[in-house]
């Protein structure tokens, strides 16, 4: 594949302005501390607008009222999104109670948003509450370091495996990888936690003074569940077990879904297999992949800076050989592994030690008290009595983990009383959207606010064609950055403009194939008409057990994407 097209190891040329910003930031300090005291604006100015991302925050505004405020000669209502670092999505009930209180008392929207990267976000934090949120997190053993911008982001880990013992081991590795790849700068502690400035020079032995060329995403995945969507990520450790014990990992590198509309130098790409490594080499290999991307990634063009482009430019074998050289190992051949699904198993599942896990479906991950469904209050009440932990899944759901038999009935009653166990269709369980409007500055079309009613319509189409219990993995993302992971869905909608989407078809249920654009810039009625026709054909013509995405490929409705660098846009 990529070996046919070898390119330079380092891209020469004028560095992007982001590289200047990082270099001049004094290891991510900038003038954030001074900016915090500027009461004339609700936002951060100059480089600080981007630098706060390294501290886990994005500056946003409420786009529903942007025009109204402009007419009143007011600046946009600036507020921050904060994303917590939570490897593997595991959070204690004490931590949950603290974040519940902060959301209620100190955010505009009052909600907790579970993300498909197994963490939570607060939306609508005013500038005066920015420092307090970091201090609140620190007080319960959490932080927001490196959850955005050019670093290794929150490390994912399969959250509901069939073998609980394996989860415990894999989760420990997710934590170790996260800690190992964290930035070493003291900027976070100095600015947010008021820790003293130390008169030593900061060093970043792994990330370097200008950090990574672009965001970098890592997973630890336990087959046969691909719930964390490994092909959306730069670096993936696939757990290999013998007799129920973790012995090593298969490494897959170079996945990523973000594109830019009309820019044919960008494409979604699945991750490539590098080989198998025994457990003891895990951190060395993780570091080697990151430092190779640090040194070879494109720092002249951020649209082509991710690992997937580096891999295609230099060639897979060249990149792999460099990782082996830096880690001091030779990869063994890939060990057999198979994925059979990626949805969460909603409801009760029995684990080891006679403990139970209850997976709750949270539509689009938005935890709020809705009329007749006080989800947020319900989870708070469960957190007050539950002796285990919560786990956030990569499908934006929540697991009440390690429930003893004696507590099962009580927790189930709380969940039912607060609308947390209402029956939903298989289709709704397998549908997901990013946040998009009103808070995301990149949003081109609705996603989270659009999906529930759109799912109703897809459910009606399934019913019409006599397959109401079937499901299609469906995802909506408000812009081509792809946070909703539409580029690994059977039906992927990518926002193009208000009320308009590109429709992608031909992904599969296990998330190992990129869907191709079927129709461009179309409205919701157009999408429904296309799906009505195609789902009707699927219902009549499918083979036994054949998913919708596989059917669209077999029936010749869509050509599969086989080599994205070459054929994604064809």
UniProtKB/Swiss-Prot annotation:
InterPro entries: CysI, NiRdtase/SiRdtase_haem-b_fer, Nit/Sulf_reduc_fer-like_dom_sf, NO2/SO3_Rdtase_4Fe4S_dom, NO2/SO3_Rdtase_4Fe4S_prot, NO2/SO3_Rdtase_4Fe4S_sf, NO2/SO3_Rdtase_FeS/sirohaem_BS
Coiled coil stretches, renumbered: none
Residues reported in the UniProt entry to bind siroheme: 483
Database matches in Gene3D superfamilies: Sulfite Reductase Hemoprotein, domain 1
The protein's required cofactors: siroheme; [4Fe-4S] cluster
Record keywords, A-Z: 4Fe-4S, Amino-acid biosynthesis, Cysteine biosynthesis, Heme, Iron, Iron-sulfur, Metal-binding, NADP, Oxidoreductase
GO BP terms, alphabetized: cysteine biosynthetic process; hydrogen sulfide biosynthetic process; sulfate assimilation
Top-level lineage group: Bacteria
GO cellular component labels: sulfite reductase complex (NADPH)
Catalytic activity: hydrogen sulfide + 3 NADP(+) + 3 H2O = sulfite + 3 NADPH + 4 H(+)
Pfam families cross-referenced by the UniProt entry: NIR_SIR, NIR_SIR_ferr
Entry EC no(s): 1.8.1.2
Cofactor binding annotation: Binds 1 siroheme per subunit.
Record-listed [4Fe-4S] cluster binding positions: 434, 440, 479, 483
Keyword Metal-binding attached: yes
Membrane spanning residue stretches: none
A molecular function GO annotation: heme binding
Enzyme class: oxidoreductase
Pathway given in the UniProt record: Sulfur metabolism; hydrogen sulfide biosynthesis; hydrogen sulfide from sulfite (NADPH route): step 1/1
Subunit structure: Alpha(8)-beta(8). The alpha component is a flavoprotein, the beta component is a hemoprotein.
Function text: Component of the sulfite reductase complex that catalyzes the 6-electron reduction of sulfite to sulfide. This is one of several activities required for the biosynthesis of L-cysteine from sulfate.
Protein family (similarity comment): Belongs to the nitrite and sulfite reductase 4Fe-4S domain family.
Name of the protein described by the UniProt record: Sulfite reductase [NADPH] hemoprotein beta-component
Species name: Salmonella typhi
Gene symbol of the encoding locus: cysI
